[in-house]
């Protein structure tokens, strides 16, 4: 295997360096992000389907069509000389300022064996295959002037990590198939949810129009800047107290949120990086129920702080969410961020449900009157949406835990 493009790294080495599982949809997400960053206004995604199961004639076997590849075509800037230079370097710095890690294209090869890239800039035509045997010499460039720029990338041959048959000689081994189900509406929802913040910012801040067309056979779905979810915003700043310079770093955090009334719609509450979902809110700030059961609350917290601290796979933080100690790598632990976030969430809730505070106080008083021996623990309840049953249940748990600690500390003689 050649190493000319990566100096000390082979592509195999790079793929082995990823510590976390790569979701099957990651290449699709990465290429959409790349197209948007290349200023594309129109992105067409043609998803190919494994039709092998349609040949099965047994009516007792449920046929599940799955995605086995896709082609994405955009009208962005094309594969420029800077892009080519960046493509041949592991962890390139080209897009670091917008939260990119410089490794996204390598996650493609965890999912697909073969990737074909074709592109036209204003003055150059580029074509090459990207696979585990890729080298810089594989890139074919030709001078070609054109007013029409585009990039076309085709993904095929799913790796055995995501699709493989069990070894018949190993009884406990099972078939593996982690490919996306070919449900075009579900895939549209997946993309819309993942890029909820990014789509909103492109539309509101950059004032850009865009259209993403999804196709599976004769089916099609469209995502545009006209039908994206509108979001409200609140923000706060946190000082990096480990920064002892004359001008210590303040990090800005933006909470994007909205209420929806679609019962069938899943609500999203997540930390974000580079406009993309990274990790769900921890339990201390998560809102799982509202005074009105027909309303959902979506919340997405974004910050440069998160942009700088995500894994290479870009699907989690590079620090533990349970860390409470400040370090040079993680100077603002998540618990500190959440403490700043809590009053913002309470403010959002009270704006929507102005009686919430008095209703909560009433529930606490009723709980104390019903079980006065739990008064101390009832008053410690920090839930934002209180119900009598839940408050009493949590207070009972705290009471029993304290009682058990007392018994263990003073054992009977």
Residue ranges and their predicted role:
Residues 21-55, 104-110:
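Conserved ATP-binding N-box helix of the HATPase_c
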């Amino acid at each position: 295997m050649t190493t000319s493009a990566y100096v000390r790294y082979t592509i195999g080495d790079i793929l082995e360096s990823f510590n976390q599982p790569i979701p099957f949809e990651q290449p699709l997400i990465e290429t959409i992000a790349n197209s948007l960053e290349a200023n594309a206004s129109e992105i067409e995604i043609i998803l190919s389907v494994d039709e092998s199961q349609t040949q099965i004639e047994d009516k007792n076997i449920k046929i599940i069509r799955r995605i086995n590849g896709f082609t994405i075509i955009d009208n962005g800037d094309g594969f420029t000389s800077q892009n080519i230079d960046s493509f041949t370097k592991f962890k390139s710095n080209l897009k670091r300022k917008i939260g990119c890690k410089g490794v996204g294209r390598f996650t493609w090869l965890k999912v697909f064996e073969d990737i074909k890239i074709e592109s036209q800039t204003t003055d150059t035509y580029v074509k090459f295959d990207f696979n585990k045997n890729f080298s810089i010499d594989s890139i074919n460039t030709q001078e070609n002037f054109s007013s029409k720029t585009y990039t076309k990338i085709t993904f095929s041959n799913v790796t055995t990590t995501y699709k493989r048959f069990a070894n018949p000689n190993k009884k406990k081994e099972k078939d593996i198939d982690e490919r996306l189900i070919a449900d075009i509406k579900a895939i549209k929802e997946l993309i819309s949810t993942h890029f909820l913040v990014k789509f909103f910012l492109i539309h509101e801040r950059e004032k850009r129009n865009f259209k993403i067309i999804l196709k599976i056979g004769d089916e099609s779905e469209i995502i545009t800047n006209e039908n994206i979810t509108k979001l409200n915003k609140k923000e706060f700043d946190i000082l990096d107290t480990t920064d002892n310079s004359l001008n210590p770093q303040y990090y800005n955090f933006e909470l994007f949120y909205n209420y929806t009334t679609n019962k069938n719609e899943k609500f999203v509450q997540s930390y974000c990086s580079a406009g993309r979902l990274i990790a769900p809110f921890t339990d201390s700030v998560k809102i799982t129920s509202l005074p009105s059961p027909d309303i959902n609350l979506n919340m997405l917290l974004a910050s440069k702080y998160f942009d700088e601290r995500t894994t290479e796979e870009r699907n989690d933080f590079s620090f533990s969410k349970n860390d409470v100690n400040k370090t040079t790598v993680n100077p603002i632990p998540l618990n500190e961020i959440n403490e700043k976030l809590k009053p913002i969430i309470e403010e959002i809730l009270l704006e929507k449900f102005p009686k919430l505070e008095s209703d909560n106080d009433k529930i606490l008083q009723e709980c104390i009157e019903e079980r006065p021996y739990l008064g101390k623990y009832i008053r410690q309840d920090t839930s934002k949406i209180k119900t009598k049953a839940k408050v009493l249940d949590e207070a009972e748990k705290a009471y029993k835990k304290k009682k058990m600690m007392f018994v263990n500390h003073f054992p009977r003689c």
